[in-house]
Each structure stands twice: as C-alpha cells, then as structure tokens.
Amino acid sequence: MTAALLESQLHSLPLLARGKVRDNYAVGTDRILMVASDRLSAFDVIMGEGIPGKGELLTRVALYWFDRLGHIVPNHLTGADPVSVVAPDEVDQVRGRSMLVKRLKPLPVEAVVRGYLAGSGWKEYQETRSVCGVALPSGLTNAARLPAPIFTPATKAEMGDHDINISFERMSEIIGADLAERVRAISIQLYSSAAEIALSKGIIIADTKFEFGLDEDGTLTLMDEVLTPDSSRYWPIEHYQSAYAQGRNPPSFDKQFVRDWLESVRIDGQPWNKQAPAPALPDDVIVHTAATYREALERLTA
C-alpha cells in the first residue's frame, strides 16, 4: 500500500491554515495554493491514518465539476499550474492534488442543496415535517426523492464542530437578502445540472454543499471543493431502490464505510466516544475506502 500524504510541508510558501483535508498556502496577496492531503475525518475527528491517493482523487473530481459547471457561475480557479509556484523539491507534494485559486472573501454560510431526504434532513423531517424551514409533504421516508431540490443553508463551524442548519431567512440576515437569493438560485441550478450528469453515469447525488466567495469586484464566485464525495452524498443507482424500500440509505461513495467501522469498534469493551484520538484504522478499511473514492471518479469520468 502506497504511503498517504497526511500533511504537506512546503518551505517556499507561507502556510495560511490546515483544514480537515486541505493545506492552504499564500501565493502573494491575491492567490492561494490549496493542497488536498490524504487526511480523513469522521465525526469531526481527523483519523491518524490517511487514505492513499484520496487528495488526488478529490482534486480530480472537483476539477471535473468546475469544468462541467463553469457556464453557470464563475469559479475560483486561476488556470495556472500549481507546480509553477513551488520549489522543485516540493513538486511531488503538489502535483495532481492541488489547485491554484483566487483569494476571495468567503461567505459565512454553507449552501446546502438536497434532492433526497437523508442524514440531518431526514432527522429534522421526522420531527417537524420540514427541513431548515422548508415545508415538505407528509409521508416521506428515509432516502425519498424530494418533489424538487430544496436549499437548506448552514452556518460554517470551527474545525471540530458541526455546521448548524439555519433558515433561509436567517441566511438573508447574515449576508443580505439579494445575495442570499442569488446564492440559493445558483446553488439549485448547480445541483440540478450536476445531478442530471451524475445520474447518466450511474450516480445519485442525494445532497451537496457549495461554498461561495466574493472577489475584489464583488462577483459571486464558486470556491473550495465542489461536488466531491467529501462534500456530497453519492449513491450508486443500482442499490437505490432496494435500500429505499427498506427505509435505509444506499451505500455511498465516500467515508461511510469508515464511519460504520468506527460505530462498531469497541475499545476496552466500550464504543468509541467520538473524541480524539480516533481508533487506528485497519488496512482493510483503508483499502476499501480508497477503492470507493476511486470508483466515484471512474464512474464520473468514464
């Protein structure tokens, strides 16, 4: 098994921040080098082991979607080769897993679009028959396809905390009504276009999370990762009907296998408390998870 890149170490650029997956470096005052590591987090805890090749796979998926959806909204890509801004001895850490992007002013909200009822949306629906203030028909079950995609924003949490679902009205208070309307309309258009493309490749995109920023001219710009298995719920179409009939989610092209293993593992006879440090991931879990991410990319680009 090839080694995972848990952390990039670039000496030629100043480090801005390390997130759950990405290491961001300043390139002058107007650009950022985003390096996607092989780190993996579950339950908001970063695992001690990485998934070899995950960062490159995520980057390739994001670039695929930026290309397919570029007609809808501008994105943060500069078009420049990330390798061009690092020292020769750093190229191997950067090639294939990085994006050189514009430095933007991020909007302080996550733009979540749901086409199916799952996860926190399903939980909220059971209690209120709505999700983030969006009323839904009675009688829906887990993994049900919604009559139309819905926009359910969330506030961005600090690393280690959960994002908090908010109403559209609250989002309008945070960023302004006009900008909120634009973000909602563009997010639904992005999701709808991507969902149609993915369906033709045998993938259901149940839900996804977009991030936007403003450039120096105030132009709304799509940023960060887009429609990757880390920011979206990807379901294989061939397993959907049987899972839906049983009221459960289909297996997904992401880290769900890791989450399931963590839920089942016992430490001194007790379940893991979902606090750092996480239990060490066995090799078979790592290999299976890497293959799952790879299959998502291969289906999309076939």
Curated annotation (Swiss-Prot):
Cited PROSITE patterns: SAICAR_SYNTHETASE_1, SAICAR_SYNTHETASE_2
EC number: 6.3.2.6
Keyword Ligase: yes
SUPFAM superfamilies: SAICAR synthase-like
A Gene Ontology biological process term: 'de novo' IMP biosynthetic process
Pathway info: Purine metabolism; IMP biosynthesis via de novo pathway; 5-amino-1-(5-phospho-D-ribosyl)imidazole-4-carboxamide from 5-amino-1-(5-phospho-D-ribosyl)imidazole-4-carboxylate: step 1/2
Molecular function in Gene Ontology: ATP binding; phosphoribosylaminoimidazolesuccinocarboxamide synthase activity
Keywords, in A-Z order: ATP-binding, Ligase, Nucleotide-binding, Purine biosynthesis
Example of a GO cellular component annotation carried by this entry: cytoplasm
Catalytic activity: 5-amino-1-(5-phospho-D-ribosyl)imidazole-4-carboxylate + L-aspartate + ATP = (2S)-2-[5-amino-1-(5-phospho-beta-D-ribosyl)imidazole-4-carboxamido]succinate + ADP + phosphate + 2 H(+)
Signal sequence region: none
Enzyme superclass (EC): ligase
UniProt similarity note: Belongs to the SAICAR synthetase family.
Name of the protein in its database record: Phosphoribosylaminoimidazole-succinocarboxamide synthase
Organism, as annotated: Leptothrix cholodnii (strain ATCC 51168 / LMG 8142 / SP-6)
Gene: purC
